[in-house]
Amino acid sequence: GVVSEAADGESIQLSIDLRLQHVQHRELLRAMRETGASAASAVTLDAMTGEILAMTNLPSFNPNRRGQLDLAAMRNRVVTDVFEPGSTVKPLTLVAALESGEFDIETLIDTSPGRIMVGNKVLPDPRNYGEITVSRVIEKSSQVGVTKMAQAIGHEHIIVVFQRFGLGQLTGTEFPGERAGRLPDHDFWSAIDRVTPAFGYGLLVTPLQLAHAYAVFANEGRMVPLTLLAQAFQEIDHSASGARQIISPMVAEKVVTVLHRVTGPAGTAQRATVSGFDVGGKTGTVHKVGREGYLDDRYVALFAGVAPVESPRYVTVVVIDEPEGDVYGGGAAAAPVYSRITQEVLRIQNVVPNSAEPVSNDRRLAASREGDSRA
């Protein structure tokens, strides 16, 4: 007899958008050709729903040619490869500073004379920025300014904020081989150990973790669980989906304001701009580590951004591994890739431009060369 009537399973659909996947693949290939990089990755999220819209890694492989498979090319670098995030983590340090009550984005910090001694280490800026606001500290990616903020609020508070944003933890996607990264946990914190996490050294993250963290800024301070399944409903029930309010909407709004300024004429990410839209983000350039310490001539170039600024929803992280020559900084190697990917993200998602006459990146760059694209 029949124990129970059969029930049809539910239909599922992946959140991956093949059009965006193609765009990422095309633009990463272009970036590798132009920079001579050894590898590249990108991931795009919908911050409101937690959907992973595209995720690309190069070098790639053809699964139909099994005799030519390169195991290194089969890695899903977005979830398996970890790196020091460098200056892309400074917006999280900004969160710690704002929550401390000691700083606002217009608080002044004296960065003179353009360098600061911490223990026996000298941390320099590209030049002496003098007395600048906290916002300008992030715009210029001032090591001196961020160091003074870190010393004022304490490394404990910064690490707690990193933990709230999911750094050092698995994202919950259950991707095979996903790594949790690492946060510093010293038995003894030297003077330099207390400040380096604030500007992204001494910790390890994956591109997906970094994108998930930036999604908090794009979603009014809420962290939504990531998913590879397309969300069936336009109205997302955040309480039911496991979303958590990890920072206040006001703090998130202030951080987005600063991220937008980073792409402005005085910031390090002028080449991240997108015609017809206001975007925000942060550059990062980190030295790679060899057997005997940091390497002087090998870098990872990073950019993490949100768009559009007036109603942020889409987050993209770009990682360019070992770019060669003079085009090795996050602002020069990774930011233009973000710009081209995000242009297509917003077009495909039918986001209406806010400018009737879009200003091209080249015209905007010609207007000002004040920013340092290497930060």
Where are the regions that the model predicts?
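Beta-lactam-recognizing serine transpeptidase/beta-lactamase-like catalytic domain environment
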Residues: G1-V3, A7, I16, A42-S87, ...
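Conserved, well-ordered alpha-helix/loop/beta-strand core segments that scaffold catalytic motifs
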Residues: G1-A40
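A short acidic/glycine-rich loop-to-helix N-cap element
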Residues: E322-A332
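Surface-exposed helix-capping loop/turn segments at secondary-structure junctions
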Residues: R33-S38, T268, I348-N354
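A helicase ATPase "motif cassette" and its flanking acidic/Ser/Thr-rich regulatory loops
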Residues: Q24, V137, Y338
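Short beta-strands and strand-coil junctions in structured, solvent-facing domains, enriched
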Residues: H22, R30, E324-D326, R347-I348
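Short, gly/Ser/Thr-rich active-site loops of penicillin-recognizing serine hydrolases
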Residues: Q234-A243, A332-A375
